[in-house]
Amino acid sequence: GEWSALETLTHVRDVIVHVYGLRLRRLFYEHEPVFADFDEEAYRPASLARGESVEYLLDTIVGEHEQLARLLEAVPDAEWAREGRHPQFGIMSIEFLARRVGEHAEEHAAQITAAARAR
């Protein structure tokens, strides 16, 4: 079924912090890192059990986006092509992951709004 607004916000936070944020930081500091898979189904129950508020989740999501934006602004043009590898999804560059950060948030924004209205 559909996730609630809280479940969706928790997912968005987990992905920005533990997937895209971590992978981007590894690309900034490592040569051709190999990225681990993110088992969302295993991670989500523990993440939801923390009982974080909507406000806390939003603050974390916004803060992580702002921090990544500052880090990305400092990346020289030639470095945007730096790559790491995911065992299942293949090559991922800084540019690809930076785009996914924004796309992922946009993909879930309408879902969060609809879930909040349906409450």
Predicted features along the sequence, with ranges:
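Acidic/histidine-rich alpha-helical segments that form the ligand environment
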Residues: 41-81
